[in-house]
Every structure is written in C-alpha cells, then in structure tokens.
C-alpha cells in the first residue's frame, strides 16, 4: 500500500508535466458591485489589472469601455482622466477614498445621473462632465464640493437651470454651459435665481460664464444680477440671440470681455448698457447682424478693443468715433470691415467703404458743407492771418485739465466734427469751424494739398501760431456740449488761448488784432514730417512695429497685453477655443542628483497655463504631474527625483479647449530625456569604502612585510654561527712535502 500511493500520484501528475504549458486559471475572480448597489453584477476580470503603483499621482483610463470607475484606484491620485468610456452615473461619495483628487475628467461618457452630497474629495477643484447625457442637474442640498472652482457641462442636453442650481459650489469661478439645450422648448431657459447661493445670496466667486451655442434669446437681468464678479461672458454662435438691451450689466461692473461672435440673429445692441462696465476691454461682435454701433460714455481708463468684422453695417459718420481716439478705442480689422450705403443714399456714401476710410470721407463732407453754409464767418482781412469765428460758432476745445505734450498739434477741426456727428452739429448748432475750404474740398489731396494751401496763405505774411508744450486748454460750454464725455486726440489743435497759455508768432509779422467777441483758430501744418516724428516720441508705437515678445523668455508678459499697451503687432495665435500647439522644450539644465530645471518656449497659441509630466524610464505608467504653471513661466524646477535615473519629461500647454497633444518627433517636440547625477552620499560612501579598503590592505601588507623581514634576519644570524674550520687539523698540522 505504501508503494502504491506514490505510483498513483506520479500517474496523475504526469500529464501536467508532459503537456505543453496552458493558460493559468485563477482560483478566485474579483467581482465588483454596481455603483449604487446593483445586484446584477457578473464575474469579470479584475479592473485593477494594469493600474500603476499605489503612489501614482496621475492616471489616464480613457477608451477602456469602463462602465464604472474601479474601486482600487491609488489613494494618492491627484488627476484622473476617464474620458471616452461607458460610465452611466456619478456620485461624489464614490470618490471619497481619493482624498487628494484635484482634477477629474469624464468627457464623452454616458452619464445621465448625478448625485451631489457629502463625502466627496475635499480638494477637487476641476470637474469636467462635458458631452454626456445630463438632461437636468440634481438639486443642491449643501456645499458638496466646497473647493470646486471649474465645472464644465458643455454638450449636455440641459434644457433648464433651476433656482440655486450651483449652490453646492460656493467657490465656483468658471462655468461652461456651452452647446447645451438651454432655451430650447417652452420651459427651457435659466431661472431667475439659478446662480444664487444656498442662502439666496449672489454667487460672488463666478468670473467666467460660457453660454455659447445655446438657444437663449436674450440675457435676462433676473439671473445675471447674481454674478457681481463676472469678468468674461461668452455668447458665441447663439442662433436665437437677437438683442442686448436693458440693465443687464448693471450688477456686473467687473465685466472685461463680451464675446458674441458668430451669432447671426444679433441685430441690435443698445450700447449704453456698457456704461455700467468701467473695466470693459474687449467687445467681439464679428459675423453678427449689426447695422449700427453708436457710441456711449466711456468712463474706463482701459483701451477698449472692438471687432465688428462681418456685420452688414450701414455707412454713416456715426461709426467714425471708433477710429477717432486710438488711445481709448481700437477697432480690429478696420480695413477689412466694410459698410454699405443706405437705400437711396447719395453723396459720399454712394458706394461701399471700409471703416478705415470713414474719417477722411466724413471730414471732407463736413468741410464742404460748413464752408458753403457759413461764408459770412470768414472775412478776407482776418482769414489771411488766422480764421476767426463769431461766439455762436466757437470751436471745440479740449476739456480743462487735459494736457498736450507736443509742440505742434495737427489742425483737424473738421475731423473733429466728422468724428462726432451725433452731437449738436446735426441740430443746427455750428460746430468747430474748418480751416480752408479750398484746402479740404477734396479728400483725395488730404493731407498734403491742405498743407500746400495753408502755406500759400502763410506766404501773405500770416503769423504761424504754435502751442508750447504742456498747454492747458480750458473748455467752453459749446465744446463740452459738442464732445460730451468723449475726449479725443483730434481736437487738440482747436483751442481758445487762455491766460495760462503761451503763444508766439514767427518774426515775419506781429500778432493779428482780433475784433471784440472773436475767438482765434490756430492754423497749423497738418501731418508734417516733424509732427509725425514728435507723435511717435510721445504716442504709442505704430501697429506695424512688432511687439517686444520672445516666446522663450521667462516671465514674459503675454503678447496680447503688450499689444493693448503699446499698439504693436503680435505673431499669429490660434484661438482659446482651439487646442494649443505643444510647447517647444528647450532643454533640461541644472541637473543634480534629486532635481532639474526644465526650459521651454511658448507655442503660437493662446495659453492659460502649462503642465509638466515626467516619469522614470521603464515606468511610463507611474507618471508624475506638476500642476498648473502660470502662462508667463518658461522654466520650472523638478524636485524629488531619484539619483542616477533617466527620466522622460514633457511640457503641455493648456487653455479652455484642453491640453496640447505631445508630438512624437520633430524639432518642436515638447518632450526630452535627461539623467540625474549619482547621489553624492553614495559617491562619498564609495570613496570612504575604497579608502578604508586601501588602508586595510596597506596595514595587512605592512604586517606581512615586517614578519617576513624578521624571518630573514633570524636566518642570517644562524649562518654566522657555522664553523668553516675542521678541528681535525688542529692536532695534526698539515705538512707540505717537497718533491724532488
């Protein structure tokens, strides 16, 4: 019996040894329960298979056909991307074990149910749920995600926002509701208190709101009043938006950017609504349906950039205010923005014009009209010396306190009239007088023909009056009525001398005597070369001058800000709704055993920040991510590296559209490899060990040599004791016999 049992065991085990190796069948399979207690869960392979080590900080699970998030995710995760999967529901309590999670991206899933509530990640600041199947948002019962700053719901079939829909997020700063179904249907839209907090107070933290691609017909003051800190409002590609009017911006004084481009139904903008936005900097209305764009009171000290390209504008001098004061307003693509004449119009607006031509056309038309309607104001005796007008036709002057820092100001009185046709000039009040009718009768000779005409008049011993620098010109009531609250740079040359002003004449003739009640108008050269040089010194650079911008300079001011400040030219940049190009990684310097400094160059794209991803060679799954880096940075240190290790590092650019995609090759590759130096501690330990070994070897060798030397000394002493004399010869002396 004892011999039979081993034989049976050998017989049973023999096929497993002889057959080829087969796939191992696990003894246990891991099963996972549904997210909200689903009982119909089949046994599946472990979802944790292939996940990185427990200390990973960033993980991408895109395109894995996941129906739920794995429950064995590393607790150290800070960024999780599970886009393009089959997720159907999300509950914040499921993510409670990810205490360090900050960014969660779940774009392009099938999420149709949300549950806000306590127990979610306390540090989560970015949640992207774009392009899912959310038809409604769950009610907020408390501050579920108190640290959430950015929420993206773009592309969801949301039809309405209920009151206090975002009260769960008291720190929310950016909300993307673009391409949703808001406004579609009878009950669709935004409720009156949709952006109110838990206690009904305004959502004071929200700064950026994107409603592009929705079906809203208008912006209602009932819901926008709860956004007092709003700085950017995006209303792009809205097919039903028809008008902007009312007191919609009364409670949003911090608004800086309004983007309504590509909204084809937008036909009316009551521009006076912008009087409540003193910090306004950008207005984008390209490719809308606007026919006019009247001025309003500009109280802002910022330079306002306006884009009206692609609108069916009607030619009128009412639009010339956009080009009057380049220090206050900048019209983008003025040469490409066209206006068409009104039906049945004649005169200067008989054909289509670009808006850049309006000032010259309006100036020529106003000069001719005023010259024909006011001939009694010009008498020959005074005209040769300086044009004078009666008090009823007093020239427009600059407001009191406005300083002029050029020696010769351009004489553009007629241009001032053309720039403000909405003033009392249309009501019969005589505006500022023009110079010479002959000099301005034809706009085709502007400006040199006008200068020639004035030169001929000055040849008749007319004194040339020149304003000294830093002259303060006080305003008259008529000038204030004409200009209203819009100070302009064109009216600097037309001023009435005040007691504080200094004037001097050329030596050819004395100052002309003025009749009582007359006000002098100074005739100066228009656009002389000397004047242009001085303008360039005291004014802002020309638009054709490239900006002082280098894409690789650390802490480089963004080119858009340089352009607003200096009126210079920036390189072409892709929009903020386009995924940015990858940065160009310059290299890695200052490499030590545990740190390195990464350098890169900015791409030709709008960038809101950068991100650095790096991993040790052979450990691509265990990738570390450096959070959002400021857009002005061009270098960033990496710490906590392992000594003597080769790393692969990539720099990514980020904007509203997402992160740039790294290129595998090319001179603009955003990735590079570098190796850290060996540890100094290990090197010192090795040197110490080698030194100790050498010392020990030296001691042992010395001991061996000493011992051997002693042995040789004893042997030499024994040799000296040996007698070489045979004692036998002492008793028997040797006798030498002589052979005869």
Curated annotation (Swiss-Prot):
<feature type="repeat" description="LRR 6">
    <location>
        <begin position="174"/>
        <end position="197"/>
    </location>
</feature>
<feature type="region of interest" description="Disordered">
    <location>
        <begin position="389"/>
        <end position="517"/>
    </location>
</feature>
<feature type="repeat" description="LRR 2">
    <location>
        <begin position="75"/>
        <end position="97"/>
    </location>
</feature>
<feature type="repeat" description="LRR 10">
    <location>
        <begin position="277"/>
        <end position="300"/>
    </location>
</feature>
<keyword id="KW-0433">Leucine-rich repeat</keyword>
<dbReference type="InterPro" id="IPR013783">
    <property type="entry name" value="Ig-like_fold"/>
</dbReference>
<protein>
    <recommendedName>
        <fullName>Leucine-rich repeat neuronal protein 4</fullName>
    </recommendedName>
</protein>
<feature type="repeat" description="LRR 4">
    <location>
        <begin position="125"/>
        <end position="144"/>
    </location>
</feature>
<feature type="compositionally biased region" description="Polar residues">
    <location>
        <begin position="430"/>
        <end position="454"/>
    </location>
</feature>
<dbReference type="GO" id="GO:0008542">
    <property type="term" value="P:visual learning"/>
</dbReference>
<feature type="repeat" description="LRR 5">
    <location>
        <begin position="145"/>
        <end position="168"/>
    </location>
</feature>
<feature type="glycosylation site" description="N-linked (GlcNAc...) asparagine">
    <location>
        <position position="622"/>
    </location>
</feature>
<dbReference type="InterPro" id="IPR003591">
    <property type="entry name" value="Leu-rich_rpt_typical-subtyp"/>
</dbReference>
<feature type="topological domain" description="Extracellular">
    <location>
        <begin position="19"/>
        <end position="679"/>
    </location>
</feature>
<keyword id="KW-0677">Repeat</keyword>
<feature type="repeat" description="LRR 1">
    <location>
        <begin position="51"/>
        <end position="74"/>
    </location>
</feature>
<dbReference type="InterPro" id="IPR032675">
    <property type="entry name" value="LRR_dom_sf"/>
</dbReference>
<comment type="function">
    <text>May play an important role in hippocampus-dependent long-lasting memory.</text>
</comment>
<dbReference type="GO" id="GO:0005886">
    <property type="term" value="C:plasma membrane"/>
</dbReference>
<feature type="transmembrane region" description="Helical">
    <location>
        <begin position="680"/>
        <end position="700"/>
    </location>
</feature>
<feature type="glycosylation site" description="N-linked (GlcNAc...) asparagine">
    <location>
        <position position="289"/>
    </location>
</feature>
<feature type="repeat" description="LRR 7">
    <location>
        <begin position="203"/>
        <end position="226"/>
    </location>
</feature>
<dbReference type="GO" id="GO:0070062">
    <property type="term" value="C:extracellular exosome"/>
</dbReference>
<feature type="topological domain" description="Cytoplasmic">
    <location>
        <begin position="701"/>
        <end position="740"/>
    </location>
</feature>
<keyword id="KW-1133">Transmembrane helix</keyword>
<keyword id="KW-0472">Membrane</keyword>
<feature type="glycosylation site" description="N-linked (GlcNAc...) asparagine">
    <location>
        <position position="379"/>
    </location>
</feature>
<keyword id="KW-0325">Glycoprotein</keyword>
<dbReference type="GO" id="GO:0007616">
    <property type="term" value="P:long-term memory"/>
</dbReference>
<feature type="compositionally biased region" description="Polar residues">
    <location>
        <begin position="490"/>
        <end position="514"/>
    </location>
</feature>
<dbReference type="InterPro" id="IPR036116">
    <property type="entry name" value="FN3_sf"/>
</dbReference>
<dbReference type="InterPro" id="IPR003961">
    <property type="entry name" value="FN3_dom"/>
</dbReference>
<feature type="glycosylation site" description="N-linked (GlcNAc...) asparagine">
    <location>
        <position position="176"/>
    </location>
</feature>
<feature type="glycosylation site" description="N-linked (GlcNAc...) asparagine">
    <location>
        <position position="42"/>
    </location>
</feature>
<dbReference type="Pfam" id="PF13855">
    <property type="entry name" value="LRR_8"/>
</dbReference>
<feature type="glycosylation site" description="N-linked (GlcNAc...) asparagine">
    <location>
        <position position="442"/>
    </location>
</feature>
<feature type="signal peptide">
    <location>
        <begin position="1"/>
        <end position="18"/>
    </location>
</feature>
<keyword id="KW-0732">Signal</keyword>
<dbReference type="Pfam" id="PF00041">
    <property type="entry name" value="fn3"/>
</dbReference>
<feature type="repeat" description="LRR 3">
    <location>
        <begin position="98"/>
        <end position="123"/>
    </location>
</feature>
<dbReference type="InterPro" id="IPR001611">
    <property type="entry name" value="Leu-rich_rpt"/>
</dbReference>
<feature type="repeat" description="LRR 9">
    <location>
        <begin position="253"/>
        <end position="276"/>
    </location>
</feature>
């Amino acid at each position: 019996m004892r011999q039979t049992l081993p034989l049976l065991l050998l017989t049973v085990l023999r096929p497993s040894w002889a057959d080829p190796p087969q796939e191992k069948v696990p003894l246990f399979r891991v099963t996972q329960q549904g997210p909200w207690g689903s009982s119909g869960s089949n046994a599946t392979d472990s979802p944790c298979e292939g996940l990185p080590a427990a200390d990973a900080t960033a993980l991408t699970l895109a395109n894995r056909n996941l129906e739920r998030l794995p429950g064995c995710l590393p607790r150290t995760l800070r960024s999780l991307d599970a886009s393009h999967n089959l997720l159907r529901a999300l509950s914040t309590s499921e993510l409670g074990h990810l205490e360090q999670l900050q960014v969660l991206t779940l774009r392009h899933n099938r999420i149709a149910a949300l549950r806000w509530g306590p127990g979610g990640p306390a540090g989560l600041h970015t949640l992207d749920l774009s392009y899912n199947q959310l038809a409604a948002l769950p009610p907020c019962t408390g501050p579920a995600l108190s640290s959430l700053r950015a929420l993206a719901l773009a592309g969801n079939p949301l039809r309405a926002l209920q009151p206090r829909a975002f009260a769960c997020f008291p720190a929310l700063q950016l909300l993307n509701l673009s391409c949703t179904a808001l406004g579609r249907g009878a009950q669709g839209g935004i409720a009156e208190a949709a952006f109110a907090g838990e206690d009904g107070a305004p959502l004071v933290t929200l700064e950026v709101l994107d409603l592009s691609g929705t079906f809203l017909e208008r912006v209602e003051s009932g819901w926008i009043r709860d956004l007092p800190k709003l700085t950017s409002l995006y209303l792009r590609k809205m097919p039903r938006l028809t008008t902007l009017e009312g007191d919609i911006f009364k409670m949003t004084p911090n608004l800086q950017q309004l983007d309504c481009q590509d909204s084809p139904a937008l036909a009316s903008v009551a521009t006076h609504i912008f009087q409540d936005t003193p910090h306004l900097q950008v207005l984008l209305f390209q490719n809308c349906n606007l026919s006019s764009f009247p001025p309003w009171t500009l109280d802002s000290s910022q330079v306002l950039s306006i884009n009206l390209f692609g609108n069916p504008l009607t030619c009128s001098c009412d639009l010339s205010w956009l080009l009057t004061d380049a220090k206050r307003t900048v019209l983008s693509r003025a040469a490409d923005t066209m206006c068409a004449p009104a039906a049945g119009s004649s005169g200067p607006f008989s054909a289509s014009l670009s808006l850049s031509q309006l000032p010259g056309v309006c100036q020529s038309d106003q000069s001719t009209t005023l010259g024909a309607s006011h001939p009694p104001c010009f008498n020959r005796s005074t005209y040769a010396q300086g044009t004078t007008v009666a008090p009823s036709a007093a020239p427009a002057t600059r407001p009191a306190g406005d300083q002029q820092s050029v020696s010769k100001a351009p004489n553009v009185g007629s241009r001032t009239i053309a720039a403000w046709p909405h003033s009392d000039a249309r009501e019969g009040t005589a505006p500022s007088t023009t110079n010479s009718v002959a000099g301005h009768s034809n706009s085709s000779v502007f400006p040199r023909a006008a200068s020639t005409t004035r030169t001929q008049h000055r040849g008749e011993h007319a004194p040339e009056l020149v304003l000294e620098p830093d002259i303060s010109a006080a305003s008259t009531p008529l000038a204030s009525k004409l200009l209203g609250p819009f100070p302009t740079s064109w009216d600097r040359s037309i001023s009435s001398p005040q007691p504080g002003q200094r004037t001097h004449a050329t030596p050819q003739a004395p100052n002309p005597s003025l009749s009582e009640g007359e006000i002098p108008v100074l005739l100066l050269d228009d656009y002389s070369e000397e004047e242009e040089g001085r303008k360039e010194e005291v004014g802002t650079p020309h638009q054709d001058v490239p900006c002082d911008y280098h894409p690789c300079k650390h802490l480089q001011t963004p080119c858009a800000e340089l352009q607003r400040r200096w009126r210079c030219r920036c390189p072409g940049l892709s929009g903020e709704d386009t995924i940015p190009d990858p940065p160009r990684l310059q290299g890695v310097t200052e490499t030590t055993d545990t740190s390195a400094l990464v350098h890169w160059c900015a791409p030709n794209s709008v960038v809101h920040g950068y991100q650095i991803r790096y991993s040790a060679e052979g450990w691509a799954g265990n990738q570390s991510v450096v959070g959002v880096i400021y857009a002005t940075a061009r270098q960033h240190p990496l710490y906590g590296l392992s000594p003597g290790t080769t790393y692969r590092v990539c720099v990514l650019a980020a904007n509203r559209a997402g992160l740039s995609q790294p290129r595998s090759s090319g001179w603009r590759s955003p990735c590079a490899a570098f190796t850290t130096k060996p540890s100094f501690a290990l090197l010192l330990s090795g040197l110490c060990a080698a030194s100790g070994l050498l010392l020990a070897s030296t001691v042992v060798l010395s001991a061996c040599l000493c011992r051997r030397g002693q042995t040789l000394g004893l042997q030499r002493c024994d040799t000296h004791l040996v007698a070489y004399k045979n004692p036998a010869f002492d008793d028997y002396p040797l006798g030498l016999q002589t052979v005869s």
